[in-house]
Each structure stands twice: as structure tokens, then as C-alpha cells.
UniProtKB/Swiss-Prot annotation:
InterPro entries: AAA+_ATPase, ABC_SmlMolc_Importer, ABC_transporter-like_ATP-bd, ABC_transporter-like_CS, Mo/tungstate-bd_C_term_dom, Molybdate/tungstate_ABC-ATPase, Mop_domain, P-loop_NTPase. This is Molybdate/tungstate import ATP-binding protein WtpC. PANTHER family: SPERMIDINE/PUTRESCINE IMPORT ATP-BINDING PROTEIN POTA, SPERMIDINE_PUTRESCINE IMPORT ATP-BINDING PROTEIN POTA. SMART domains: AAA. The gene is wtpC. The complex is composed of two ATP-binding proteins (WtpC), two transmembrane proteins (WtpB) and a solute-binding protein (WtpA). One of its GO terms (cellular component) is plasma membrane. It comes from Pyrococcus horikoshii (strain ATCC 700860 / DSM 12428 / JCM 9974 / NBRC 100139 / OT-3). Keywords: ATP-binding, Cell membrane, Membrane, Molybdenum, Nucleotide-binding, Translocase, Transport. Residues 2-231 form the ABC transporter domain. PROSITE patterns: ABC_TRANSPORTER_1 (PS00211), ABC_TRANSPORTER_2 (PS50893), MOP (PS51866). The keyword rRNA-binding does not apply. It catalyses: tungstate(in) + ATP + H2O = tungstate(out) + ADP + phosphate + H(+). Its EC number is 7.3.2.6.
Length: 345
């Protein structure tokens, strides 16, 4: 449907370099990256707000690079929602329809239909300043969807919401997508949004799109250490592999496949299980470790473990920490399955 070809742009402090990807019909495509990676600049180029220095954008095979925003039939939701403060919710949602010269009765019908679907039909007489953050976001989404855009562009759509409201809107976004059948490009730094909503994801680091693929594949099989570290592979180990065994100091770690020579592997902290004593487990990698640090992260706790000079980090729940009575300086057992190990190419 949409094809982005070799887009480059120097814009203020941002630099985009040779960005290329495609978006399929009906897909929810996530652009995931840290703050300052150029995600918003890329989205605004796709929207037609900013012109690229090089490259082009194709919609169904037609070059739309020079087409102004109002000619693209895209809906763009900026991070601050950009609702008109002097207008009611009804008039905000109706704005795009009125620009398209839609008859008044049809405007009213379409606005009420989308408002009912998004659960804001009781707010149509209100002004944006009287709404909660979640309600404002629903209004912004309604305004975007009511015109039936070919492409929905969303810039950090849930960034300004509290955790509970965000989780609810993510669940509802799935339902709205089924109901309205839209195609979306969604910019975010949130792993939760990417994993919950995305079909495919593009990882953006330092102005470059460094990996594109199915969301689950990218999260489980990052192509580089840079991508892996961004995606939460805190444990990256170097050793010498002999078939399915990796030698790291005095440790012998079973690998998911045969590898030979010097390699580097990654293990997510959440894939490491902690026991206070040796137990039977399907995991082939079980090691004694000393707890060198305990970091409180709220619902989770991060443990820093020393496995014979090899430092690993593991997540456990707060309740597990209390139940097991884990303290700094104590010895525990750390286990992880061979299938949880990612071998870098």
C-alpha cells in the first residue's frame, strides 16, 4: 500500500538516513525507538508536513512525495492531540467532514456513529478543556477515523495517559481497528504498545531504521547487539562455542543450536528463573549464583547475579522476593532454557 524509499532528511537536530520500508493494507505498523531517534520527523514526512531532502513516498504505486497534506487522505494524530479548544467535541470531530463539503445531515450522522463506537457520544456538547486525557484522546481518534482515511498516522498516542487509561485504550484500539478496518503507522517508544498492537515493527535508532519484521520475531531475534540492548537484552555474554555448548569462563551453557568459535549471545532478564535450592526443571542451564544487587522497580525487582565471575541480571516479582527471602550476598540458583538464548549473527 505505502512504500517509503530511501528517505533522508537533516532537520534541526535530527538526521534521517536512507529510511526504507513498506506498509501493507490493513496493517498496524509500529515505528519503535528511543526519544531523539527521528521518529516524529519521519511521520511528518509521510504526512506531508515536512519535505524530505532525498527519497520518495509511494501510495499504491503513485509518487506522493510532493503532494500537500490535505491531498493525501491521511489522518494524523500528533502527541498533543491538537484539538481546537474553542470548538465542542462535535465540531472537533466534524471538522474534516466539513472541509470536504459533506452535507450537514450526513456530517451529524457520521459524527454520532463514530462517537458511539468510541464511547464519547455523551461528550459531544463539551469543550476539550473539560475532558480527561483519555477522553481527549478518544476525540482525536474519532476525528481521525470519521473521514475514513487511507492511512492513520499516530505520534505517541498514549504517551500522556496514566497506566490504567493507557491499558484500556490499547485494548479498545484493537476493537476499533476491527470495526473500522484502518491501516496505521504508529510511532512509539513503548514496548507494550508495540507488542500489543503491532503486526510488524521497524526499530529506529540514531536516525536509521535498523531492523524491520514481525513484532514477535524482532523482539526475540534482534539482528544486532544495538537492537538487542534497546529491546531489553541486558545480559550479553561472549564465549567460545563448540557445537551446542558455550564455554564462558568455568561455565558451560547449552545453546539452542550448533555454533562454532567465538560468539556473543543474549538472554533477557525475564527469561531467568530463580530458586533458593536446586530443583528439577526442564531448563538445561542451572547455575549457582551470588546475589550482588537488588533493585526495586515497583511490581518487579531486578537482581544482579554473579555466576563465577559472569554477571547476569534477572527479574522476579516483589512477592517472589519476599517469599524466597532473597537478600544481598546470599546464594541462589539461576536457570534458563537453551531456547531463551539468542545467538547473534
Amino acid at each position: 500500500m505505502l512504500k517509503v524509499e530511501s528517505i533522508s532528511k537533516d532537520y534541526r537536530e535530527f538526521k534521517l538516513r536512507e529510511i526504507s520500508f513498506d506498509v501493507r493494507e490493513g496493517e498496524h505498523f509500529i515505528i519503535l525507538g528511543p526519544s531523539g531517534s527521528g521518529k516524529t520527523v519521519l511521520l511528518e514526512i509521510i504526512a506531508g508536513i515536512i519535505s524530505p531532502d532525498r527519497g520518495r513516498i509511494l501510495l499504491r504505486g503513485e509518487d506522493i512525495t510532493g503532494l500537500p497534506p490535505e491531498k493525501r487522505n491521511f489522518s494524523y494524530i500528533p502527541q498533543n492531540y491538537a484539538l481546537f479548544p474553542h470548538m465542542t467535541v462535535f465540531d472537533n470531530i466534524a471538522f474534516g467532514l466539513k472541509l470536504r463539503k459533506i452535507p450537514r445531515k450526513e456530517v451529524a450522522r457520521k459524527v454520532r456513529e463514530v462517537a458511539e463506537s468510541l464511547g464519547i457520544d455523551h461528550l459531544l456538547h463539551r469543550k476539550p478543556r473539560t475532558l480527561s486525557g483519555g477522553e481527549q484522546q478518544r476525540v482525536a481518534i474519532a476525528r481521525a477515523l470519521v473521514v475514513k482515511p487511507e492511512l492513520l498516522l499516530m505520534d505517541e498516542p498514549f504517551a500522556n495517559l496514566d497506566v490504567q487509561t493507557k491499558s484500556k485504550l490499547i485494548r479498545e484500539m484493537k476493537r476499533w481497528r476491527k470495526e473500522f478496518g484502518f491501516t496505521a503507522i504508529h510511532v512509539t517508544h513503548s514496548f507494550e504498545e508495540a507488542l500489543s498492537l503491532g503486526d510488524r515493527v521497524g526499530i529506529m535508532l540514531r536516525g536509521r531504521l535498523v531492523q524491520v519484521g514481525d513484532v514477535r520475531d524482532v523482539f526475540s531475534k534482534p539482528k544486532s547487539e544495538e537492537v538487542a540492548r534497546f529491546l531489553g537484552f541486558e545480559n550479553i555474554i561472549e564465549g567460545v562455542a563448540n557445537g551446542r555448548i558455550l564455554k564462558v569462563g568455568d561455565l558451560r551453557i547449552e545453546l539452542p543450536r550448533e555454533v562454532w568459535g567465538k560468539v556473543r549471545v543474549g538472554i533477557r532478564p525475564e527469561d531467568i528463573t530463580i530458586f533458593m535450592e536446586g530443583v528439577k526443571t526442564s531448563a538445561r542451564n542451572v547455575f549457582k549464583a551470588r546475589v550482588e544487587g537488588i533493585e526495586d522497580l515497583g511490581a518487579l525487582v531486578k537482581l544482579t547475579l554473579n555466576l563465577g565471575g559472569i554477571i547476569l541480571r534477572a527479574f522476579i516479582t516483589r512477592s517472589s522476593l519476599i517469599e524466597l527471602g532473597i537478600r544481598e550476598g546470599e546464594e541462589v540458583y539461576a536457570s534458563f532454557k537453551a531456547s531463551a538464548i539468542h545467538v547473534f549473527p
